[in-house]
Amino acid sequence: MKLDSGIYSEAQRVVRTPKFRYIMLGLVGAAVVPTAYMRRGYTVPAHSLDNINGVDTTKASVMGTEQRAAMTKGKSLQEMMDDDEVTYLMFSSIM
């Protein structure tokens, strides 16, 4: 099955129109960029040198902490996370 060459040229024409460019710019500006900045702050929190120097990283100190599970059966998403995390999760699902 061959594609009609008119379909290809029509798709190129639509992509080159200013309306499509503004839609893509709006998508990047409104969804992708804020999500990237939020993820950076969420996964790599800011630490001061005083806090880092006071951390005990021995195996004994780590073994005493409780294990947290990502998902547990029988609980809804709202019960497991606070409102900020749910908002972040829904916002990052745009990507």
UniProtKB/Swiss-Prot annotation:
Q: Which organism is it from?
A: Saccharomyces cerevisiae (strain ATCC 204508 / S288c) (Baker's yeast)
Q: Could you list the residue ranges that cross the membrane?
A: 20-38
Can the keyword Hydrolase be found in this entry's annotation?
Answer: no
Identify its membrane topology class. Answer: Single-pass membrane protein
Q: Which residues form a coiled coil?
A: none
- The principal location of this protein is mitochondrion
SS bond list: none
Q: Which UniProt keywords apply?
A: Membrane, Mitochondrion, Transmembrane, Transmembrane helix
Question: Which cellular components does GO assign to this protein?
Answer: endoplasmic reticulum; mitochondrial membrane; mitochondrion
What is the protein's name according to its record?
A: Stationary phase gene 1 protein
Induction pattern: Abundant in stationary phase (G0) cells. mRNA levels rapidly decrease upon exit from G0.
Enumerate the subcellular locations listed in this protein's record, separating them with semicolons: Mitochondrion membrane
